[in-house]
C-alpha cells in the first residue's frame, strides 16, 4: 500500500491541492535505525539527514504555495539509549530542526513544548504508560499544544 512507503517516498501520493502539510516523524527512524543518521550535507534518502533534506525540498517543490510544518518527535523513555546506529533520539530532533531552519520551514518542537516526558515517572504513568505512545489523555494534551502552536504559525 502507498502508506507503507517511507515518508520521503509518499510525496508523490499526497493530495496536490493541500493547503497545509504537517509532517510528524523521526521517532520510528530512531527506533528502527534502518538508515544511518548521516550528515547535514547529505541530500539523498539513504541517511536520515539526507532524507529530511530530500523530503523538505520535495514538499517545497510540490507545494510552493502551501504552508509546510514539521513537528519533532516526542520524548520517549528509552531516549538515552543509543539506537542500532549509536545515535540518540535528540540527534534526530536536532536534524529535523536544523534542516527545517535551512529551508525556512516552521517547526513545532514537541520535544520541547509537549509536556510529555515519559522519563518523569508521573508523566509516564498518566500520559504515556508504555514510555513511547501517548494514551488518550496524552493525545488530548498533544492536540491542545499542536492547535495552539499551529495558530502561531
Predicted regions and their residues:
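Generic structural signal for well-ordered alpha-helices
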Residues: 52-56, 93
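Short, flexible active-site loop motifs that bind/organize anionic cofactors or intermediates
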Residues: 38, 58, 129
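Surface-exposed amphipathic alpha-helices with a cationic face
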Residues: 56-63
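Catalytic His-Asp segment of secreted/periplasmic serine-dependent ester chemistry enzymes
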Residues: 73-153
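Proline-centered flexible-loop/turn and helix-kink motifs
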Residues: 16, 64-65
